[in-house]
Amino acid sequence: MPTWNREALAKRAVESILKQEYTNWELIIVDDCSPNYLNLQGFIEGLADSRIKYIRNDYNSGACAVRNQAIKLAKGEFITGIDDDDEWLPNRLTSFLKDQHKLHQHAFLYADDYICDTSGYLSLESLRIYPKPDYNQQLFNKKNIVGNQVFTLTSRLQTILFDTQLAAAQDYDAFYRLAEQYGGPFKIKMATQILYVNHGEVRITASRKKFSGYFSFYKKHSSKFDKSSKKYQLFTLYYIRKKPMSFRVFRRLLCLRNVKRYMMLHTVFKDKKF
């Protein structure tokens, strides 16, 4: 679990791991040189739980480098991650472990998420589910359909690691390379994580570098994309950059999916789902 300057949220994430039905886990927390860290450090020390390892770096190295640092230290057979502003349901590890045999044929496992757009919730029933499609290579060529976390063999992720040269789309890139090397992933049929999307604190992934990161991802992998996927990716880049699209460019990127996306963004159909 990478963390930076979000003590209260990180505590909630840790508490959700402590509530796991499956108890034979290790948690590696890497603090990327947070200026405010004493409360979190004291909280971890107070738990006196040998399964939890807390490391605070002496300098800020970035989210990808911190993730790689934790991945390299992992000792278990399987590995997954958690962002410091998210929360696991008690059955998350158990659910993945029930399907661990799928990793003989699939690169990794992934699941649906619950979405919370406030600081808290009363019950799971009050949250909406963010549904993810079953794996499809063509769809994965167009966008990240698996989300921000996966469950896989530790040895695989230690081989792949996150690309520290990417300013954004690091998850997409790492999971894409995992699928390339070890086979398409498998989706389990339940939601096991809560993503908090409006907690009001600094968001690590929000920066002006988003366009640069996605453009670098496109250049890195575009030779593997068919024409339709390239059009979809390029439309996404225009959207991220918030650059007006000329009619000439729109014609060049014309495909059914992009027409639907354009309608969602610019017309009375913007509230529709496609």
Question: Where do the PLM segments sit?
Answer:
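Acidic donor-binding segment of Leloir-type glycosyltransferases
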Residues: 14-56
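C-terminal subregions of glycosyltransferases and related glycan-biosynthesis enzymes
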Residues: 15, 19, 180, 189-274
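The conserved acidic donor/metal-binding loop of glycosyltransferases
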Residues: 83-87, 112
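Glycine-rich, basic loop-to-helix element that forms the pyrophosphate-binding segment
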Residues: 57-74
